[in-house]
C-alpha cells in the first residue's frame, strides 16, 4: 500500500510539473478520451460523426507535440468533418481508417477504440467525443511497448521517432534497434507494466504504443493517460491472416506521415506472396507435413496452435501443419501449447519436415543437438531423412518479413532451398 501511495504522489507531482511546463509554453499534455474506449469492430466510421454533439471543446494546446496556436483557422467541429473516403485494406481486419477533409483521419481499432489523427499544424476540432483519443500525425519521441510493431518503424526508416522501448537490448534481434540502444538514440524505460513514468515525461513522449499485454496491467494504461500520454493498443497479432498482420505497416505509415511509402512497401510484399501462392500445384494428398516446435527446459515440447500466424504461414506456403488437430484458436488464445514428448512424438514422428524454433532455447546446427534434447526424436522421419531446419530468432520480431518467410518455407517444402541464401532459416546437418 505504501508503495502504491508513493507512486500516486510521484505521478501527481509529475502531472503538476507537466501542466506548469504547458502553461509556460513547454510540453503540452494529451487530449485524453473520456470514460472508456468503446469496443468496436473494423468498418466504416462514417456514422460516428453524429456522436460529436454535446462534447466539451478541447484545448489544442493540450495535445503533446502540437503548437498551441494550431492552424490559422479556428478548429472545425468534429461533427462537421466531411468524409472523403476509407483505406482500402486487403487482408487486415482489426483496424479501419476513414479519411476526412483537411488531412484528418479517424482510426478504428477493434476492441480498442477510436483515434482522431490530426495534421501536425492543425488545431484540435471542437466537439470530439469522449471515446475518441486525439493523436497528432508524425509524433516524436514515441514510447513503444509493442515489440512486434518496432519492425514497422524500421522498415519505414522511422526508428528515429522511437525514443523509449519496454524491451531490453539483449532481447532484440533487430540490429538497427540494438545499435540505437547502444548509442543512446533509444532508451530502455522498464517493463511494459512498470515503465519509468518520470523518464517518459522528461523525454516528452507524445504517444505510447502498447501491445494487448497492457490489458493485464490496466492501471499502467490509466496512469499514462493521466499523465497526458495518449495510448494506442496494437492488435496486429490478432489478425487471422499473416498478410493482415503485416498490413498494419499502412496504419503506422499513416500515423508517421509516410502512408504512400508504407503502401508501396506493402504492395511489393503482397505481390511476392501472390507469386508464391500462384506457384502452388500440390494437392492435399501431396502436401508435405511440417512440425514447428522447440524443447523446453522441462523436457516438454512447445508447439504452435492451429490458426497461429506461424502455422498459417506453413499452410500458405503449401505445407500441412502436423498439429492442426490441437484445440484453440491462434488468433485469440495463446499462440503456443506445451505438450509432453510422448504426445509430440506421436504427432511428429511421421512429419516430412521439422522446423526447430530458436527464439527460446537457442539455435541448433546439428541433429545431435536435437537428439540430445530428446533421444525419442532420433527415429522421426524428418531426422532420419535429414530434413530438419532451424528458424532464426529474428523470425518473430521481423514483422514485415512475412512474405519472405512464406517464400522461404515454400522453398524448403519444395526442396528448392539454398541453405546459404535463406534469411530466416538454416539447415540442421
Residue ranges of predicted features:
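Bacterial N-terminal signal peptides that target proteins for export
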Residues: 1-13
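C-terminal motif of bacterial Sec signal peptides marking the signal peptidase cleavage site
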Residues: 19-23
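Bacterial Sec-exported substrate-binding components of ABC uptake systems
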Residues: 24-150, 261-292, 417-429
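A short, structured surface patch at a secondary-structure boundary
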Residues: 105-201, 207-214
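Extracytoplasmic ligand-binding site segments that recognize negatively charged/polar headgroups
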Residues: 140, 147-155, 165-176, 216-219, ...
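Structural recognition of the beta-strand scaffold that forms the well-ordered cores
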Residues: 141-144, 161-165, 207-211, 231-234, ...
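Structured C-terminal subdomain patch of bacterial secreted/periplasmic proteins
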Residues: 239-267, 277, 353-429
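Flexible, glycine-rich surface segments
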Residues: 276-365
Amino acid at each position: 500500500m505504501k508503495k502504491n501511495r508513493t507512486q500516486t504522489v510521484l505521478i501527481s507531482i509529475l502531472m503538476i510539473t507537466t501542466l506548469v511546463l504547458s502553461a509556460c509554453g513547454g510540453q503540452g499534455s494529451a487530449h485524453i478520451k473520456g470514460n472508456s474506449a468503446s469496443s468496436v469492430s473494423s468498418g466504416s466510421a462514417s456514422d460516428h460523426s453524429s456522436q460529436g454533439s454535446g462534447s466539451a471543446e478541447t484545448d489544442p494546446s493540450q495535445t503533446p507535440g502540437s503548437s498551441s496556436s494550431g492552424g490559422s483557422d479556428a478548429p472545425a467541429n468534429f461533427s462537421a468533418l466531411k468524409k472523403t473516403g476509407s483505406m482500402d485494406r486487403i487482408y487486415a481486419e482489426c483496424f479501419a481508417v476513414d479519411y476526412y477533409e483537411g488531412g484528418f483521419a479517424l482510426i478504428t481499432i477493434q476492441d480498442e477504440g477510436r483515434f482522431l489523427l490530426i495534421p501536425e499544424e492543425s488545431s484540435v476540432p471542437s466537439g470530439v467525443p469522449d471515446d475518441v483519443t486525439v493523436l497528432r500525425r508524425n509524433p516524436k519521441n514515441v514510447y513503444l511497448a509493442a515489440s512486434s510493431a518496432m519492425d514497422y518503424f524500421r522498415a519505414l526508416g522511422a526508428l528515429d521517432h522511437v525514443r523509449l522501448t519496454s524491451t531490453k537490448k539483449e532481447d532484440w534481434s533487430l540490429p538497427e534497434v540494438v545499435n540505437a540502444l547502444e548509442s543512446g538514440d533509444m532508451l530502455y524505460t522498464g517493463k511494459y507494466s512498470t515503465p519509468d513514468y518520470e523518464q517518459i515525461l522528461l523525454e516528452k513522449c507524445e504517444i505510447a504504443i502498447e501491445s494487448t499485454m497492457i490489458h493485464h496491467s490496466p492501471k499502467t494504461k490509466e496512469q499514462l493517460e493521466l499523465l497526458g500520454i495518449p495510448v494506442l493498443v496494437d492488435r496486429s497479432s490478432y489478425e487471422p491472416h499473416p498478410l493482415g498482420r503485416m498490413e498494419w505497416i499502412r496504419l503506422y505509415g499513416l500515423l508517421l506521415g509516410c502512408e504512400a511509402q508504407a503502401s508501396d512497401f506493402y504492395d511489393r510484399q503482397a505481390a511476392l506472396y501472390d507469386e508464391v501462392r500462384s506457384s502452388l500445384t500440390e494437392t492435399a494428398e501431396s502436401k508435405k507435413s511440417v512440425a514447428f516446435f522447440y524443447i523446453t527446459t522441462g523436457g516438454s515440447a512447445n508447439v504452435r496452435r492451429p490458426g497461429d500466424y506461424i502455422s498459417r504461414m506453413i499452410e500458405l506456403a503449401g505445407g500441412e501443419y502436423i498439429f492442426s488437430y490441437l484445440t484453440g484458436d491462434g488468433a485469440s488464445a495463446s499462440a503456443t501449447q506445451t505438450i509432453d514428448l510422448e504426445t509430440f512424438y506421436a504427432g511428429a514422428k511421421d512429419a516430412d519436415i521439422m522446423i526447430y524454433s530458436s527464439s527460446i532455447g537457442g539455435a541448433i546446427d546439428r541433429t545431435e543437438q536435437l537428439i540430445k534434447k530428446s533421444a525419442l526424436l532420433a527415429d522421426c522421419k524428418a531426422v532420419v531423412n535429414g530434413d530438419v531446419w532451424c528458424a532464426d530468432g529474428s523470425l518473430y520480431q521481423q514483422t514485415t518479413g512475412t512474405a519472405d518467410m512464406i517464400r522461404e518455407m515454400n522453398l524448403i517444402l519444395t526442396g528448392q532451398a539454398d541453405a546459404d541464401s535463406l534469411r530466416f532459416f538454416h539447415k540442421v546437418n
